[in-house]
């Protein structure tokens, strides 16, 4: 993979040197202006790294424009900085100021307690046993309305802190919701005959089967509801899982700079739930057995990093969960609060949502994503 990236970089530089004269003559002025404007809107290092990685999307830059950009004085003046950024990307060194513990916690997943593990396991069509997790005993939870919150952080939390409306609001113009996937290669358990090519355990680069597909479904529901969405379809956890939150943070910062109208950021993942023996379980909504259960994971300042407004994100999560509870009381699992920030310090409308588990099927996750997106849209359009 590293050889492929390096080859792409050398090839693009060589082509730019050979074709500079032709590009300068034939490249449309508007195309060049738009490309340079994108340089202004997005940090140069991030933009070029996205290009070299090949994850900018089909409409990122045309070939002629890319070649022209490689030869601009702006790029030549910043060659040293770009080289340093490229080296850092390959080495995947974590930023000491960032929230690296999130990667490790997400990889660990959830282990069912003995009480949550059924005595008799019924295997479903994709080979995974099924459970529906719900809280019935308020002991150990912070309870706010119909929402149960498991505070696994060192930050103080009381139900009285969650009263009032959440802070984030829809704007009048421009993109309003950013959907991103810090761990985009996470995937599900497919039925026999529908398997995908794996890149790691329960992970794939096939965007029709991983979290990118789930984000596509959410984006479509939100768009149909009249909400403007930016969906980042990049994979930040491949080829290295470590450092994914650093890389997605750089993109979130870039999007918020480019689109200041964005008030809500959804980082869409899937969970991994297993018993003490390592058996993967699927989690299903009790009211719709064709839909997986979802869970909000809310970051805090419990780990010592600055995140004073984290409870605003939690208030939003509670509002969305109350909306969904009316029709699907068990669609959402209890909310989990952790010490890590998960990049949620960037807005007061940032949520990490786990759609299903590694044991769920893609179809169950898609159905859950669409139900969730409809409830999320209804909540933020009502504003309370």
Annotate each language-model stretch with its function.
Residues 1-15:
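N-terminal Sec-pathway targeting helices
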Residues 13-262, 272-278, 370, 378-383:
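N-terminal catalytic or cofactor-binding beta/alpha core of small enzyme domains
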Residues 173-176, 225, 262-264, 290-294, ...:
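Envelope-exposed proteins and targeting segments
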Residues 178-181, 229-231, 264-267, 295-298, ...:
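Structural recognition of the beta-strand scaffold that forms the well-ordered cores
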Residues 184-187, 235-239, 270-275, 301-304, ...:
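Solvent-exposed loop/turn segments at secondary-structure junctions
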Residues 197-201, 273-308:
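A short, glycine/acidic-enriched catalytic loop
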Residues 309-336:
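Active-site-adjacent substrate-binding region
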Residues 331-384:
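Active-site-adjacent mobile loop/cap segments within catalytic or ligand-binding domains
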């Amino acid at each position: 993979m590293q050889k492929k990236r390096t080859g792409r970089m050398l090839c693009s530089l060589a082509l730019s040197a050979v074709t500079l004269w032709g590009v300068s003559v034939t490249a449309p002025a508007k195309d060049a202006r738009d490309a340079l404007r994108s340089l202004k809107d997005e940090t140069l290092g991030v933009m070029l790294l996205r290009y070299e990685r090949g994850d900018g999307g089909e409409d990122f830059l045309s070939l002629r424009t890319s070649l022209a950009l490689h030869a601009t004085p702006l790029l030549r003046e910043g060659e040293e900085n770009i080289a340093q950024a490229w080296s850092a990307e390959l080495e995947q060194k974590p930023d000491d100021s960032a929230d690296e513990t999130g990667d490790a916690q997400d990889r660990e997943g959830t282990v069912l307690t003995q009480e949550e593990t059924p005595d008799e396991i019924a295997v479903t069509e994709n080979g995974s046993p099924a459970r529906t997790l719900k809280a019935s005993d308020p002991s150990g939870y912070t309870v706010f309305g119909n929402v149960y919150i498991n505070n696994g952080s060192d930050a103080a939390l009381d139900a009285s802190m969650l009263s009032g409306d959440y802070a984030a609001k829809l704007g009048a113009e421009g993109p309003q919701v950013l959907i991103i996937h810090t761990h985009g290669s996470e995937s599900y358990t497919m039925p026999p005959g529908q398997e995908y090519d794996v890149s790691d355990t329960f992970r794939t680069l096939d965007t029709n089967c991983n979290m990118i597909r789930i984000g596509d479904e959410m984006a479509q529901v939100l768009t149909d509801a009249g909400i403007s969405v930016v969906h980042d379809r990049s994979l930040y956890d491949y080829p290295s899982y470590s450092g994914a939150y650093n890389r997605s943070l750089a993109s979130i910062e870039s999007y918020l700079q480019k689109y200041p109208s964005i008030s809500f950021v959804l980082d869409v993942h899937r969970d991994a739930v297993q018993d003490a023996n390592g058996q993967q379980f699927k989690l299903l909504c009790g009211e719709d057995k064709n839909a997986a259960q979802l869970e909000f994971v809310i970051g805090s300042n419990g780990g010592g990093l600055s995140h004073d407004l984290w409870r605003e994100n939690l208030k939003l999560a509670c509002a969305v969960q109350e909306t969904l509870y009316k029709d699907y009381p068990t669609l959402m699992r209890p909310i989990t609060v952790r010490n890590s920030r998960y990049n949620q310090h960037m807005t007061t409308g940032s949520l990490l949502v786990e759609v299903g588990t590694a044991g769920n099927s893609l179809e169950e996750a898609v159905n859950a994503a669409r139900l969730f997106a409809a409830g999320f849209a209804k909540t933020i359009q009502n504003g309370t």
